[in-house]
């Protein structure tokens, strides 16, 4: 079902006022693309349906990675590419969160702050994985950066999927200890992660006052690890929820009041058991918050490490899968086509069934 309101609608309302928000040219470029997505401004295709024999216009998408309308097909492509990479082992979901003291630096030096987050998270897992007391094997990790909270505030954190074990020096698989109930002690991981992250920032060009470091060392850092998945089948589908997710989906926008220039959207209160609530912001404040999560140009927000890195998988993954007796795992496919404009089989309004569309021309 198509959402009633979209981020593009809100951008359309404030298009003449965007310059007053103090955004960068990179922000404006992304917002401009989102506002034009799947409109006449992007051009499109004229398709003829062999079911209803009507012509249908399919406008092109902007394909910007921050666009709420364009993420569905990218997520499906990513999931399909991961199907052949699963191992027949338990997987854990680990979340590394930055304290709010670094938020202002994330806005001004996003590449450094976010890259350091990836590095520190992987270094933390490596330290525990390499230690025979905890595992004694080379680990792997798929990490996805999210920068938002439910209210669109800045809340940088990494969602990581980690196989429950690693490769010994002899090349044999070693299962995670603790009877598979948890990966490593999260309290210990939090302390190591804090040290690793601060060390990365100190090595960077960022000049952060010592009082900021004192403040972050005086508080507990959040590292959260969920219990293992029921089976590898659920791993990629689960991570697929996070890979191409953006700050807010169009479906969360409950109301757009054009006259008063107000936006109401739904949010979950995780401190209250995920209870749903509604928030109302001015359209300008909504856009300002949305723009907080436009990543720096060229920044890679999904990264693979260790035995899940591209180089390692290409050379050694088939052998490890054979050792672990990994079977081909079928992932449930969505019925939504990868791209509405380019799809061969789609369902159009007033059509009774999924039908073949013939591309009969460009707009």
Regions from the language model: what does each represent?
Residues 1-363:
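Beta->alpha loop/short-helix hinge microenvironment recognizer with preference
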